[in-house]
Amino acid sequence: MKLQKPKGTQDILPAESAKWQYVEGFAREIFKRYNYAEVRTPIFEHYEVISRSVGDTTDIVTKEMYDFYDKGDRHITLRPEGTAPVVRSYVENKLFAPEVQKPSKFYYMGPMFRYERPQAGRLRQFHQIGVECFGSSNPATDVETIVMAAHFLKEIGIQGVKLHLNTLGNPESRAAYRQALIDYLTPLKETLSKDSQRRLEENPLRVLDSKEKEDKVAVENAPSILDFLDEESQTHFDAVRQMLENLGVDYIIDTNMVRGLDYYNHTIFEFITEIEGNDLTVCAGGRYDGLVAYFGGPETAGFGFGLGVERLLLILEKQGVALPIENALDVYIAVLGDGANVKALELVQALRQQGFKAERDYLNRKLKAQFKSADVFAAKTLITLGESEVESGQVTVKNNQTREEVQVSLETISQNFSEIFEKLGFYTQ
């Protein structure tokens, strides 16, 4: 047996991980502007945390979850999404308490797990960035969160994104619509896919979300949720739409969009872009006002979204967006002879402690090979340190692009390299 990574996973190697770090850092910066703070939850939860909140009949629970019994016979699942664990944490840690500022705003980043057919941008271990806002039923919260997602996508460089918007109404509106959908689909049951025939019995709204051709045909003339909204639901949705328009945010009403999780109510949304003729959802979310109470907390409004990092990076690559990643070394020290080994170690460490990104040769190679390494690392400056330089205490620092040189003491480099760096045309932060 070859020792290889499991199917549906990937190794994120240094050239790629730099992109991941940029995206995650960029998201943190945007979220901070909106007063969000990071929360980190376990990657595994009790099975019921996911099954009861996401929905027993959803594809995630019935087909895709990684679940097992641990050595204490506890039913455990690897988290397939981020909202339910954050809500569980919110309730368990009593973050609904009066002394905690409302609304409470959290973001998270980390791996999720679903057993599904691996494909580009969709793996069995995937990574999600998401936000959750608790304690505000104000439709302005819906809009602020949607706009924050749009803000992130625009500034990171995603092109051609369209906002798809729908409402699922409150529980009363949803129940009325559910019955109308059953009445419409029941005569068409035999024309539906096998999965949608099952969904019709368990959760008919999920038929609207099916990607199967026969199901798409069947729901073409299905009733619209917009015809079943009561006054409260209509008022909320109208307010969301008006505020989006006030902020100049274009949107498309998509009444067949229901999202894959059972906990949503009122506003739901997706940001969709087209790649090679296919629509790809890059970010999605919505309101879930009943979920905190479902976990044993008080009635608390909630709104959030999630986006997949793998898919985001895939879209950026397909759209030719180059992330502004700085990988260059500030200094490379080429070492000549055993007599320079100790001093090279002292020097590279002194540079790092001054805040410079520095590397040295450890392999006793010929200078030509060391200079090539400096080029591979895109080193801005180059120091050649041999036994004669150690004895004299003087060394040449070279701009590795222009070949301009300055002669300086080793003591100056160890104490104030910034001055030399700037003299050679580079600027320190």
Curated annotation (Swiss-Prot):
One of its GO terms (cellular component) is cytoplasm. Transmembrane segments: none annotated. One of its GO terms (biological process) is histidyl-tRNA aminoacylation. It is an enzyme of class 6 (ligase). Its main location: cytoplasm. InterPro entries: aa-tRNA-synth_II, aa-tRNA-synth_II/BPL/LPL, Anticodon-bd, Anticodon-bd_dom_sf, His-tRNA-ligase, HisRS-like_core, HisRS/HisZ, HisRS_anticodon. It catalyses: tRNA(His) + L-histidine + ATP = L-histidyl-tRNA(His) + AMP + diphosphate + H(+). One of its GO terms (molecular function) is catalytic activity, acting on a protein. Keywords: Aminoacyl-tRNA synthetase, ATP-binding, Cytoplasm, Ligase, Nucleotide-binding, Protein biosynthesis. This is Histidine--tRNA ligase.
